[in-house]
Amino acid sequence: MPSLPHSHRVMLDSVTHSTFLPNASFCDPLMSWTDLFSNEEYYPAFEHQTACDSYWTSVHPEYWTKRHVWEWLQFCCDQYKLDTNCISFCNFNISGLQLCSMTQEEFVEAAGLCGEYLYFILQNIRTQGYSFFNDAEESKATIKDYADSNCLKTSGIKSQDCHSHSRTSLQSSHLWEFVRDLLLSPEENCGILEWEDREQGIFRVVKSEALAKMWGQRKKNDRMTYEKLSRALRYYYKTGILERVDRRLVYKFGKNAHGWQEDKL
């Protein structure tokens, strides 16, 4: 594993001995990455082109130091064009173990819509290892599919959208909530989805392309296909929101899904 260039080591050492100090007076919770490091004298631009150039890739995420966490965040922002104004630096002044223990909701609270993106990337590293980045184009395509299906913008998440989650009716910004609400709204469903076992939370996609078209219309994404949508649905297996069912087009709500049970609506 190649070592970091001298300029990066100097910069990271500076970060370690200043911004990571628990009593750093200028570490405003609302301060963004660009606020902290806009001066090139203290924040020379990273030249990462691939993950293997980054030192954080030599360590399992649970063993990352605060410096590794910072480096990983910077890589994600550079590689996937995340708006750094969405991310509060102080919210990620933590170790890798603390980072890995964060839930998706905590990522969203810490970084808005960027938080969903970061959570998705971290979970892929934890399950696939750094091989997730071996094919840069493939990893970008995977993340792009997730972004397309969850109203994220791969061309750059705008800061005004950082906390724009809506969880009402069929306007929910989470795909699984949209599916849930569609199941609970016969007047909107039009035979697109149907329950197979209401009590167990098992349902079937009857009209796959119609579902993709409706979701695309809700998110103003005319490129949405069921292939992309189903990839995003399968991602929910990792979070416990959906559970795998060994039948085509059939899904089941998991332990972390809410609002679908008749007695808990």
UniProtKB/Swiss-Prot annotation:
CDD domains, per database record: SAM_PNT-ESE-2-like
Keywords for this protein: Activator, DNA-binding, Nucleus, Transcription, Transcription regulation
Any single Gene Ontology cellular-component annotation: nucleus
Main location: nucleus
Tissue expression as described in the entry: Expressed exclusively in tissues with a high content of epithelial cells. Highly expressed in salivary gland, mammary gland, kidney and prostate. Weakly expressed in placenta and lung. Isoform 1 and isoform 2 are differentially expressed in different tissues. In the kidney, only isoform 1 was expressed, while prostate expressed both isoforms, with levels of isoform 2 being higher. Expression is up-regulated during keratinocyte differentiation. Several epithelial carcinoma cell lines showed lack of expression.
Single GO biological process annotation from the record: trophoblast giant cell differentiation
Subcellular location: Nucleus
Regions recorded as binding DNA: 173-254
InterPro entries: Ets_dom, ETS_fam, Pointed_dom, SAM/pointed_sf, WH-like_DNA-bd_sf, WH_DNA-bd_sf
GO molecular function: DNA-binding transcription activator activity, RNA polymerase II-specific; DNA-binding transcription factor activity, RNA polymerase II-specific; RNA polymerase II transcription regulatory region sequence-specific DNA binding; sequence-specific double-stranded DNA binding
Comment field on protein domains: The PNT domain acts as a transcriptional activator.
Described function: Transcriptionally activator that may play a role in regulating the later stages of keratinocytes terminal differentiation.
Family: Belongs to the ETS family.
Protein name as annotated: ETS-related transcription factor Elf-5
Protein species of origin: Homo sapiens
